C-alpha cells in the first residue's frame, strides 16, 4: 500500500495509507521513525559518486575563497581603523585646546573677581553700609533700611528716644492714639501685647497699624504674575504714547517708565480736563459685590466699572479693549472693522518691558483691573497733594525733624551739609511737580527694584490713612468746614478689626486664624480705601480742604515738608518730655 501525507484537503483513494498532520507539529505530518534512513535515500547517494565528489569540490573551493577574502580584509583592517579614529583624535585635540582656554579664562576670572571683591570691600568700607537706600526730599540725605522701610523707620524713632517701647515721650497724632485706645477697649484679648501704660503709644501697635495700611492695596485672593502697580504704570505709559507720539521720551526698561510717571500723569490729567465734562472717580457700587472686592468668575456685572472716569478714558484711548457687552453686535462690527479693537495693548507692553512669559488680560481679570484703576487714581491724588509743595519753608514750622532722629539714633552729630532739612531761604518757591518727580526717581523706583511685587499702598501708607480718614470727613460734613475731630476711631472699625487679627496672628499659629474672616475684613478695608480715594479726588482743592478742616493735624502734619514725609512713612513722630 502506497503511503500519502496529507497537508490540505484529504481524499481517500483506494489502497492508500494516509498520515494526518497534528497540532503538535503544526503543518508537518507525523513521519514514521527512521523515515529518512530508508534504503531509498541511502541508495540514491551511493548510486551517484561523481555528484558527491563535485559537491565536495565546490565546498572546498568556497572555503578557500572565504579564507582569501578574510585574509584580504585582515590586511586592510588597520588602515580602516586609522581612517575612522583620525577624526576622533582631531576632535579630542580641539577639545583639549578648548579646555585649556577655559582653564586660562577661569584663572583670569578668579583673579578679576578677587580684584572686584577687594574693590567692593573697599567701597563698602567707604560707604559703611550695603543696605538699600531711598530719598524722599531733595534737600535731605538718603535713608537706608533693612526690609520694610516704614517699619524700620518706626524702630529708629523708638531707638532715638533711647527707651525703646517703654518710652511715653513719642506721639504720632490724635488719629493713631484714638485707634490704640479703641483697640484696647474693644479688643482687649488682641491688645495684650500692646504696652499702653502711662499713655504711651506702643511700638508693636504702630508697626502693626502701618503694616495694615500697607496691605490695603494688596489682593489676598488669587495668585497673579503682575501687580496692579505695574499694570497702572503700563496703562499710563500707553495713554501717553497715544496722546504724545511725537514727544515720546526714550525708555528702555520698566524703571525708566517709573521715572517718567509725572509726565504720564500730567498728560492724563490734561486729557481728563479737556475731554471730560464731569469726572467721576467712583464705580457703580450697585452692580458690585457689597462686602467683597474679588470678582466671582473674574468679571463683575456689566457696567460696574465703566462709570469710573479713569476706566472710561482708558477705553476711549484704546489702551484697554472695550468692556464685554459694552456695544451691541451691530455697533461692535463697525468699531472692530479692522479686527484690532480687542487687541490688548497691556499684554504687548508687559511682554516688552517686564518679559515674564505670562499673560495679562485686564478685561478678563477685572479684580486686577479694578485695583489697577484704584492705583492710577491714587497716583493722581498723590500728584495733587504734592503739587507746588514748598519743602524749603521755615524749619520750626515742621513737626518732622529728620536730623534730630538720625542724630539721636546713631549717636553722631548732625551734619548740616548732609541733613539740611527745610532752610527757609526759598519760602516762596513753587515746586510744581518737582516733588513728585523726585519721589518717582529716588523713592518709588528703588523700592520697586528691590521688590517687584510691591503695590502703591506699600510705598505710601500715609496716603491710605488719608483715604480711610475721608469717611470721617464726609460724616462730619463738608471737607472745607473748619472743625477739629479727635473721635475718628469710631469710623475705623474695619481697620481696628484688621489690626486685631494681625496682633492675634503674631501670637498664634497661622493655621489657627480663620482665613475667611481675614479675607472678609481685609476686603472691607480695601473697599473703604477705594471709596475714600473717590471722595478726596472729587474735592477741587483737596490739600487746602484738608488743611482748613484740620484733618492733616490729626497726623501731626503741619507743613508741606511734613506732608511729603507723611505720605511716604505713614507717621510723623514727635518727641515729648516725660511727665
UniProtKB/Swiss-Prot annotation:
The keyword Magnesium is assigned to this record: no
Cellular location(s): Virion; Host nucleus
Signal peptide range in chain numbering: none
Ranges for region Interaction with major capsid protein/MCP: 1-50
* Pfam families noted in UniProt: Herpes_UL25
Which family would the database say this protein is a member of? Answer: Belongs to the herpesviridae CVC2 protein family.
Q: What does this protein do?
A: Capsid vertex-specific component that plays a role during viral DNA encapsidation, assuring correct genome cleavage and presumably stabilizing capsids that contain full-length viral genomes. Participates in the interaction between the capsid and the tegument through interaction with the large tegument protein/LTP.
Q: What is this protein called?
A: Capsid vertex component 2
- Where does this protein come from, organism-wise? Varicella-zoster virus (strain Dumas) (HHV-3)
